[in-house]
């Protein structure tokens, strides 16, 4: 029996391991089937604040709903150019389009009647005032 030199894995295997090792939540929109906006949740003395990155999304394409301690942000990223002709041009697109929904468990009792949502420059900020006794359901209008 003789030993043969090992020259490494084929490129596809190396790419598979590189992608796996470098995966992070910031890259979640590059995984097929996943469209999930990035969020930050801040809990202060009187409020819980949720910031949601929604670049390229219109306010009217987003819904915010609060139900029994869970905040759901849902909507759709619409491809405005999908009907444009690409004849004669090479087309490259790394942006994702389609529906999304993200549900967050809020770590405090919330006054559902005072929840506010503001949308500006692709950032949705939902402010949830804390209260000792919480309500269970509320649809929130975005300003």
UniProtKB/Swiss-Prot annotation:
Mainly resides where? Answer: cytoplasm
The sHSP domain covers 30-143
Q: GO terms for biological process? A: cellular response to heat; cellular response to misfolded protein; cellular response to unfolded protein; protein complex oligomerization; protein folding; response to heat; response to hydrogen peroxide; response to salt stress
Localization, UniProt: Cytoplasm; Nucleus
Induction details:
By heat shock, and under conditions of deoxyribonucleotide depletion and DNA damage.
Give UniProt keywords alphabetically: Cytoplasm, Nucleus, Stress response
Q: Which family does it belong to?
A: Belongs to the small heat shock protein (HSP20) family.
Q: What else is known?
A: Regulated by the spc1 MAPK signaling pathway.
Protein's recorded name = Heat shock protein 16
Q: Which organism is it from?
A: Schizosaccharomyces pombe (strain 972 / ATCC 24843)
